[in-house]
């Protein structure tokens, strides 16, 4: 009888491998199918309420983003010294924290883009249709204009005197410096978005979708810490456009192209790097 029990224990112990593979090798049993690319045009979207609901979510998120962040910037510039205000770190936390909160709130509705550069990068990767991408960008820009407009309504005089939170290339830097900072900063952000929302990672690790807003917000925080002294940190064309339109100063408009060209190039490079180098999508066999 004892021998039979010992044999049962041995059989039970040998049912499983002594060591489990780490990383992606441990997930080979899970069936993963690459989602099909989004169509370039999807006319059916225009008759769907979820399409317009997503656009409204992007508008509201970008509105709140500009409202909180531009108010924070105004508070910093209004202070007599950095010690009596939130400082650059506080401004960076305001931008990163709002992205964290707003991506968390809107990810299940619109994907939580809140940024035309993010939308552009995801469009290049065929994650959404051209119809949806254009609609998102328009709603993001409108939300940003309204958000900055509300801030100006609260402080009309100080808003113009303190620069309106508009992005410009700061003294001591060239336009090339500003463009480079915007390209690299947006690359960091959009690459983080791709990595944090990767469908293959989501299939392997169930916690990834819940945690996605955290690295995205943290990336925004770090980029602001690095590039506020150079350009005030754009990396979001809607944010730059909203502040520029409401501030409406010649200096802001002279530099404004940098805050569209730079982020779009950075987003395109991030999409190419993630899709071709990291995921090797062109080499996948159907």
Swiss-Prot record:
It comes from the Eukaryota. GO terms for cellular component: plasma membrane. Residues 7-18 have a biased composition (Basic and acidic residues). It holds the Pfam family MIP. The chain crosses the membrane at residues 56-76, 90-110, 134-154, 176-196, 210-230, 258-278. A motif (NPA 2) lies at residues 236-238. Induction: By water stress. A motif (NPA 1) lies at residues 115-117. GO terms for biological process: response to water deprivation. It is a multi-pass membrane protein. Belongs to the MIP/aquaporin (TC 1.A.8) family. PIP (TC 1.A.8.11) subfamily. Aquaporins facilitate the transport of water and small neutral solutes across cell membranes. This is Probable aquaporin PIP-type pTOM75. It comes from Solanum lycopersicum.
């Amino acid at each position: 009888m004892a021998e039979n029990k010992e044999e049962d224990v041995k059989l039970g112990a040998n049912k499983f491998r002594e060591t489990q593979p780490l990383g992606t090798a441990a997930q080979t049993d899970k069936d993963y199918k690459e989602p099909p690319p989004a169509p370039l045009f999807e006319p059916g979207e225009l008759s769907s309420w979820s399409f317009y609901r997503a656009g409204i979510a992007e508008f509201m998120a970008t509105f709140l983003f500009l409202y909180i962040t531009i108010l924070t910037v105004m508070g910093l510039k209004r202070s007599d010294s950095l010690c009596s205000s939130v400082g650059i770190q506080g401004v960076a936390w305001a931008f990163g924290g709002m992205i964290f909160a707003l991506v968390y709130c809107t990810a299940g509705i619109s994907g939580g883009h809140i940024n035309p550069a993010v939308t552009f990068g995801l469009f290049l990767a065929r994650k959404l249709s051209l119809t949806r991408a254009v609609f998102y960008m328009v709603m993001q820009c409108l939300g940003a204009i309204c958000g900055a407009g509300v801030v100006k309504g609260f402080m009309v005089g100080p808003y113009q005197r303190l620069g309106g939170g508009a992005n410009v290339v700061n003294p001591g830097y060239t336009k090339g410096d500003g463009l480079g900072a915007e390209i690299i900063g947006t690359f960091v952000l959009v690459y983080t978005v791709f990595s944090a929302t990767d469908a293959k990672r989501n299939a392997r690790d169930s916690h990834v979708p819940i945690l996605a807003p955290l690295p995205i917000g943290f990336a925004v925080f770090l980029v602001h810490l690095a590039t506020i002294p150079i350009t005030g940190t754009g990396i979001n064309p809607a944010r730059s456009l909203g502040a520029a339109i409401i501030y409406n100063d010649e200096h802001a408009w002279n530099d404004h192209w940098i805050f569209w060209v730079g982020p779009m190039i950075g987003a395109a490079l991030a999409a190419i790097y993630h899709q071709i180098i990291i995921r090797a999508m062109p080499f996948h066999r159907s």
